[in-house]
Amino acid sequence: MDKKSSHPAGAARDILIELRNAGVYRDGRWLVRNVDLSVERGEIVTLIGPNGAGKSTAAKMALHILKPDEGMVSHKPGLRIGYVPQKINIDRTLPLSVERLMTLTGPLPRKEIDAALEAVGIAHLAKAETAHLSGGEFQRALMARALARKPDIMVLDEPVQGVDFSGEAALYELIARLRDDTGCGVLLISHDLHLVMAATDRVICLNGHVCCSGTPRDVTSSPEYVRLFGSRAVGPLAVYEHHHDHTHLPDGRVLYADGTTADPIAGSTMGPRGHCHVEDGHHHDHEHHHHEGGQPRA
């Protein structure tokens, strides 16, 4: 998937969220400090770091949930935020359909629910119980709930947690496509140092402070990153690169770069144009190539 430029030459920067020298102090220590971070319209920024690095604290500052004890946080006036939390407290033993999940935070017109579910590829699951969804399907439902409110920016906290590698790849493709289709900004938070989506415009590596930032390849080759995580962290770090001209939807259809969709050949894992069929949580290896440590992995 070709990455769109977040701010073409000569274009005015449309900053949605900005943190400047922001920090949070609690119980005699700084949870995070000196955080400089911004997300522009149409830009994907990925915040990575180990557990306890302050990623969630930084995200809460960005969302105005936490007030910084130093520095500042600013939002574009009238900013609409679509938030997909790391965890959502839902009793999975109680009946709750996907379409009902969509309205837990407020009513939505039926057409908006249908459009959002279609956009994330799970329109066929509108009546399904959330307890019966796979990890990838549930994440898509949460993204649809955020997307339905037409956000200027989506903040995704560990959106691929609990999803296997093929499911992660499908969700990363979806995130990039939603950015391309809507023009929204995306702030993605992840603890996984070994998988960064190639569609990311910038990566910010956090460990109590910003230790390095830049493109995925810039970050993994920076001396600060190597000092923090060790030379062994560089080799296995996988920068996910997907060179297909299509995205696989959970219902089996194939969405192509030109916006058309097609059904897979009955009884086959190959789509009508000869492409393999990837579902959230399952992956059949038909010449998919991922790059890990600079070496292709078939």
UniProtKB/Swiss-Prot annotation:
It is found in: Cell inner membrane. Transmembrane segments: none annotated. Keywords: ATP-binding, Cell inner membrane, Cell membrane, Ion transport, Membrane, Nucleotide-binding, Translocase, Transport, Zinc, Zinc transport. The lineage of its organism: Bacteria, Pseudomonadati, Pseudomonadota, Alphaproteobacteria, Hyphomicrobiales. It comes from Brucella abortus (strain 2308). ATP binds at G49, P50, N51, G52, A53, G54, K55, S56. SUPFAM superfamilies: P-loop containing nucleoside triphosphate hydrolases (SSF52540). Pfam families: ABC_tran. The complex is composed of two ATP-binding proteins (ZnuC), two transmembrane proteins (ZnuB) and a solute-binding protein (ZnuA). One of its GO terms (molecular function) is ATP hydrolysis activity. Coiled coil: none annotated. Residues 276-298 have a biased composition (Basic and acidic residues). GO terms for biological process: response to zinc ion. This is Zinc import ATP-binding protein ZnuC. SMART domains: AAA (SM00382). Belongs to the ABC transporter superfamily. Zinc importer (TC 3.A.1.15.5) family.
